[in-house]
Amino acid sequence: MKYMYYGIGILILSLGISLTIQSGLGTSPFDALLVGLSKKIGLTVGSWEVLISVILLICNAILTRKKPILLGLITAFITGIGIDLWLFVVKNTIYLNSLLSKLICFGIGLVLIGLGTAIYLQTKFASTPIDHLTLIIRDLSKRTILFSRTLVYALFLVLAIIFKGPIGIGTLLTVCLGGMLLHVFMPIVERHFLSKNRRGY
């Protein structure tokens, strides 16, 4: 059951990322960095997801003074493939001709990112290096997930600007609301998991 929820979470997360990219309003700072690197240097967005994850994996190991959690690369790899597949689907099925349609597409994507991340993190199986970094900062600073997520987003916002990623109103909304959505969804998903465990699932 845990692995099923893990898969569902990654599926929802990668769809959400693809929708924010398709909206053209600016993606999350991390995804903006991936798109910027893809356009500036080459390779697909999914490929950069994996490469940046390797770098973050090393950084996380240094911060925690522990061996790198290699399982995180599995999640990054699956998420990268998911993003590329969903981008192919949405680019050929979703056509946005007005600002309202773009805002709706972005809004749905942002909510799905928060929900998908909360679901797969709750399984406690192989969090992506960027999500692991969020949890590390939360534990080291003894602050909320909202604080640590916003701090991580701010860091990647600077990098996205350097590599000229698609930064727009959507990027700013992600910085302001991304951590808040995760903060809201985490306890909701946790209660659902606890309820399932009590029923013996």
From Swiss-Prot:
InterPro entries: YczE/YyaS-like. It comes from the Bacteria. This is Uncharacterized protein YyaS.
